[in-house]
Regions:
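Non-transmembrane "mature" sequence context
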Residues: 1-97
Length: 97
């Protein structure tokens, strides 16, 4: 993922992301929660789709099972992340609708 994508999903600026990364600073609770949600969803996608690059490609494309929405864009809220994770679990069980 690009720094721009990560920063947008975490709700922080790219410069803030780079500073936090360089100084290994502790993130505030809300940003930490968003980072956990992002990491968890990416891990599930990689597990289900069995390929890191394929998982990132899937997360960046409109998905019919999400009403044509882009999974990464849904990860800004917990409700959106839940929708993405539910679809990934459905795919894992062979139910892609």
């Amino acid at each position: 993922m690009t720094d721009a994508e990560i920063a947008r999903l975490l709700g922080i600026g790219e410069a803030t992301l780079r500073r936090a990364r360089a100084s290994q600073a502790t993130l505030d609770a809300a940003t930490s929660d968003r980072l956990y949600r992002l990491s968890k969803t990416i891990a599930i996608a990689e597990e289900v789709l069995e390929n890191g690059e394929g998982a990132m490609s899937w997360l960046r494309r409109e998905q019919p099972g999400l009403g044509g929405q882009v999974p990464l864009k849904l990860l800004v809220t917990q409700a959106g992340a839940d929708q993405v994770e539910t679809l990934l679990r459905r795919i894992d069980y062979g139910v892609y609708t």
